[in-house]
Amino acid sequence: MNRLGRLSLPLRPQVCLLCQTQATMSSPLAGWQAVRSMATVRQRRQAARMVLSSNVDKSSLKQGRSKRDRAGPWSGMNQTEARLRDAPRSRSRAALKRSGDSEDDKQKPDSPLYKALKMQTALAPIPYGRRTAIKNKIAEVSSFDQFPLLPVVRHSISSQALSRTGDIVPTPIQRLAIPQLLKDPIPKRTSKDVSDHEPNFEQYLLAAETGSGKTLAYLIPLIDSLKRMEVEDKEFEKWEAEQKAKEREEKLKNRAFDIEPEEAPLSDAGRPRVIILVPTSELVAQVGAKVKALSHTVKYRSGMISSNLTPRRIKSILFNPSGIDILVATPHLLASIAKTDPYVLSRVSHLVLDEADSLMDRSFLPTTTEIIEKSASSLHKLILCSATIPRSLDNLLRKRYPDIRRLTTPNLHAIPRRVQLGVVDIQRDPYRGNRSLACADVIWSIGKAGDTEPTHPFLAQAGPKVKKILVFVNEREEADEVAQFLRSKGIDAQSFSRDSSSRKQEELLEEFTESPIPPTAEEIMLAKNKRRQDNSIPFVFPEQQNKPGAERGLPNTKVLVTTDIASRGIDTIAVKTVILYHVPHNTIDFIHRLGRLGRMGKRGRAVVLVGKKDRKDVVKEVREGMFRGQALI
């Protein structure tokens, strides 16, 4: 108001409203740039098949909500915010926490332990309280005699399966799995009790570390169940034959002049009782050999088929007139046979998916699912086993088989402490970035060094021990190149990949998978006489002289350069050293490649070559986790 008591008119602003609006508005380009920069800074989530699950041992059954958690009729009375329909809602605290934008999370310092592995989200922990409980449970079992096995099956364990090992003691996964798999299957439910989509058979997941005896853990109960079913089948066949004889007599009395063709009995040819599926033909040969070895004492008919065999050979094995009890095969080959002959899967009572993380992956999942669905009518038990459980497999099992029984060992997703990991920096002198030269130098130093482990006295008398080394590369093309370079440096190296011929693959695997058999007394005497003759002759023959142009070689050392084809399931019990030519892509590959060592309680040594572009922090944390004996989390 002015001096006269009147209202004064508002003054015009010095700046127009349009200019004020433009000055206060934020630039859209700046916001777009901020969003774009944040999207590039934030790391992408890895694929589910490359990330291990954190809840392997937890059941999929949902617990019912308590009465306190349920919303009552007056639950909406005490609201502190107005929840209008058309008004945009702000993001909840849970959504902010999932996105990583929460203010509370910014204040929390990152844990220094396993920081790089958490950035990769390669592994997640299983509660160590659960691991301790499993250790206490399996400590009560110390012998195979505590299992309710048939006497002939128990005798075959010591005479065939574990004849080359000193102590015949069950491993942790065998202590967990054998009692559970020996239980009688659940009774068949009627259509009223179960829906069409719910499986009508028992499901088991065997999750244990590499080299822990998972094959024997499911093979022993299967053979025991097979022999028990044979007794039941003989009794049923005897009763069925008596019933058919009575019916035939009644028909002859009532219709003496009628001629009716009799139905031919259904043969057991091409109708196995137990099917073991593995992803590769190399695993078919390995698992099939174990099944065949046990059949020498426990009488049953077994066979193995893979793409390495001819169609005529496959037909003679599968459709043998005497029948077949246990079949080891790959999924694609078995599915193609089942399309032409559906009766192949009509009598399957036990189905095993060995290396389930590969068989339930995208490449095998449609074929594996088809086999499970076709054999579901007669199936009693479905068994999945693997050393690594990716998040994708865990989610799939919780969705399809929520009632699956999870049998996990305390050392799941861990590398044994008896395996030592060394690191070689190839950027330093004398390598200067030459990875192949560093690999050759490591092999020469290992080959020239003496053997630290005590050898069998008879093997020491027979001759020098041959050291066997595995070299893992990431690319298939580099296997031949690295093997050729090592041969140029005087190292006996061979390449093993999918491009190799089947006969060459079998010969190479036999050298690196079979442990040496103790020699007989005659072989020891021959070796002693030969060594005595060589030392007594004072002459040097022309063929024994070193030629001037001859290259020196590394004696008593064999090297196999391979890809991940030999990292899964291959029982390389004769290998004591593994060299990682490249740093693995994820922790799953670390576990499988280093899992070729330390099998069945033996020691091993691994060397990883680290270059300029490799993740040294990941290698460091893997090494620290191996030293502590913890899971790679």
From Swiss-Prot:
<protein>
    <recommendedName>
        <fullName>ATP-dependent RNA helicase mrh4, mitochondrial</fullName>
        <ecNumber>3.6.4.13</ecNumber>
    </recommendedName>
</protein>
<dbReference type="InterPro" id="IPR001650">
    <property type="entry name" value="Helicase_C-like"/>
</dbReference>
<keyword id="KW-0378">Hydrolase</keyword>
<feature type="region of interest" description="Disordered">
    <location>
        <begin position="50"/>
        <end position="115"/>
    </location>
</feature>
<dbReference type="InterPro" id="IPR011545">
    <property type="entry name" value="DEAD/DEAH_box_helicase_dom"/>
</dbReference>
<feature type="binding site">
    <location>
        <begin position="208"/>
        <end position="215"/>
    </location>
    <ligand>
        <name>ATP</name>
    </ligand>
</feature>
<dbReference type="GO" id="GO:0003723">
    <property type="term" value="F:RNA binding"/>
</dbReference>
<dbReference type="InterPro" id="IPR014001">
    <property type="entry name" value="Helicase_ATP-bd"/>
</dbReference>
<feature type="transit peptide" description="Mitochondrion">
    <location>
        <begin position="1"/>
        <end position="38"/>
    </location>
</feature>
<feature type="short sequence motif" description="Q motif">
    <location>
        <begin position="142"/>
        <end position="175"/>
    </location>
</feature>
<feature type="domain" description="Helicase ATP-binding">
    <location>
        <begin position="195"/>
        <end position="407"/>
    </location>
</feature>
<dbReference type="GO" id="GO:0003724">
    <property type="term" value="F:RNA helicase activity"/>
</dbReference>
<dbReference type="Pfam" id="PF00271">
    <property type="entry name" value="Helicase_C"/>
</dbReference>
<feature type="compositionally biased region" description="Basic and acidic residues">
    <location>
        <begin position="98"/>
        <end position="109"/>
    </location>
</feature>
<dbReference type="Pfam" id="PF00270">
    <property type="entry name" value="DEAD"/>
</dbReference>
<keyword id="KW-0496">Mitochondrion</keyword>
<comment type="function">
    <text>ATP-binding RNA helicase involved in mitochondrial RNA metabolism. Required for maintenance of mitochondrial DNA.</text>
</comment>
<dbReference type="GO" id="GO:0005524">
    <property type="term" value="F:ATP binding"/>
</dbReference>
<feature type="compositionally biased region" description="Polar residues">
    <location>
        <begin position="52"/>
        <end position="63"/>
    </location>
</feature>
<feature type="domain" description="Helicase C-terminal">
    <location>
        <begin position="458"/>
        <end position="633"/>
    </location>
</feature>
<keyword id="KW-0067">ATP-binding</keyword>
<dbReference type="GO" id="GO:0005739">
    <property type="term" value="C:mitochondrion"/>
</dbReference>
<keyword id="KW-0809">Transit peptide</keyword>
<dbReference type="GO" id="GO:0016887">
    <property type="term" value="F:ATP hydrolysis activity"/>
</dbReference>
<keyword id="KW-0547">Nucleotide-binding</keyword>
<comment type="similarity">
    <text>Belongs to the DEAD box helicase family. MRH4 subfamily.</text>
</comment>
<keyword id="KW-0347">Helicase</keyword>
<dbReference type="InterPro" id="IPR027417">
    <property type="entry name" value="P-loop_NTPase"/>
</dbReference>
<feature type="short sequence motif" description="DEAD box">
    <location>
        <begin position="354"/>
        <end position="357"/>
    </location>
</feature>
<keyword id="KW-0694">RNA-binding</keyword>
